[in-house]
Swiss-Prot record:
Organism annotation: Salinibacter ruber (strain DSM 13855 / M31)
Keywords: ATP-binding, Magnesium, Nucleotide-binding, Transferase, tRNA processing
Disulfide pattern: none
Protein name: tRNA dimethylallyltransferase
InterPro entries found in the cross-reference section: Dimethylallyltransferase (IPR039657), IPT (IPR018022), P-loop_NTPase (IPR027417)
Reactions this protein catalyses: adenosine(37) in tRNA + dimethylallyl diphosphate = N(6)-dimethylallyladenosine(37) in tRNA + diphosphate
First-level EC class: transferase
Enzyme Commission number(s) from the entry: 2.5.1.75
Protein task: Catalyzes the transfer of a dimethylallyl group onto the adenine at position 37 in tRNAs that read codons beginning with uridine, leading to the formation of N6-(dimethylallyl)adenosine (i(6)A).
Protein's UniProt keywords contain Zinc: no
């Protein structure tokens, strides 16, 4: 294979994404080894040190094959938002490039990926009292009155907001009253992301993907998922009803361990909810016309690198495939 030029900050960054259980880890490790790359994980749960089995975190042997970022770096006591992730990931990417290596973004957390590639509006925090007051007004005045106010103070945002989506109306008014500026101002002045990306979505036949999901859930349980959840439940100060513990693969075991559902129902729910999550991920990825789709079983690291080469040099031709 023709070697790539030395990495540069102006180069698009190869991103490998796809639904859960599609097989991103194996092919991304091969690509990282061939590219002399460091893997920048884009996963909203693998970043927590306490969550391993239920997040399908790369094993120690897999992590030794290439440097990994955002794997087990934070405690459950340290919330991590998509915006915070994007800022931290941009810093890591700069550091990787300064070391003369390529960053390779890998993962399927859709909002985190969007924040990294396209940015998020930098909206200041708003006092909870503002939202409380708006909710009281919702009760006394009704949603129509709040939407009419939004039309007056932020007509651009009102035009893009369904008046029946009450919480979105309240959020827009909350920003206006809390910051003195309309929500549309923050969206319109959103900073441009510092890097460009070329993204490959790995996909599989639906039934085969669902089979892989079911089998992976079984492996997680065999590997001790319930013990992991018990340990997490014993940590002082951890909120069991908030992310990441309210997410799939943790909330169902928590319900089981609390006695709310039996074991078989827990297994059924984890599998069903994970399949539904994979479907939502695929729907999200189809929003982006610039993404390249590939069939996971046939895709090798060389195929992914070929996509990167095409992005680096538009005159470099390669057959485009589709696995949507």
């Amino acid at each position: 294979m023709e070697p790539l030029s030395e990495p540069d900050a102006s180069d698009p960054i190869l991103t490998i994404t796809g639904p859960t259980a599609v097989g991103k880890t194996a092919v991304s490790l091969e690509a990282a080894e061939q590219l002399n790359a460091e893997i920048v994980s884009v996963d909203s749960r693998q970043v927590y040190e306490e969550l391993t089995i239920g997040t399908a975190k790369p094993s120690p042997s897999e992590q030794r094959r290439a440097p990994h970022h955002f794997i087990g770096e934070r405690s459950l006591h340290e919330p991590f938002s998509a915006g915070a992730y994007a800022k931290a990931a941009n810093d890591r990417i700069r550091a990787v490039l300064e070391r003369g290596r390529r960053p390779l973004v890998v993962g399927g957390a859709t909002l985190y990926l969007h924040a990294l590639q396209y940015g998020l509006a930098d909206i200041p925090d708003v006092d909870d009292e503002v939202r409380d007051e708006l909710n009281q007004r919702l009760e006394s005045e009704g949603q129509d009155a709040l939407y009419e106010e939004l039309q007056q103070v932020d007509p651009r945002q009102a035009a893009e907001t369904d008046p029946t989506k009450t919480q979105k109306v309240i959020r827009a008014l909350e920003v206006y009253h809390g910051t003195g500026k309309p929500l549309s101002y923050y969206y319109e002045n959103q900073p441009e992301p510092p890097f460009d990306y070329v993204t490959v979505v790995l996909n599989r036949d639906r039934e085969k993907l669902y089979d892989r999901i079911n089998q992976r859930v079984d492996r997680m349980l065999d590997a001790g998922l319930l013990d992991e959840v018990r340990d997490v439940m014993d940590i002082d100060g951890v909120q069991l009803d908030e992310p990441p513990l309210s997410t799939i693969g943790y909330r169902e075991p928590i319900q089981h361990l609390k006695g709310d559902i039996d074991y078989d129902e827990m297994v059924r729910l984890v599998k069903r909810n994970t399949r539904r999550y994979a479907k939502r991920q695929l729907t999200w990825f189809r929003r982006y016309d610039e993404y390249h789709w590939r069939a996971a079983p046939e895709t090798r690291a060389e195929d992914l690198i070929e996509v990167l080469k095409n992005a680096l040099d538009p005159t470099h031709s390669a057959a485009e495939g589709s696995a949507r």
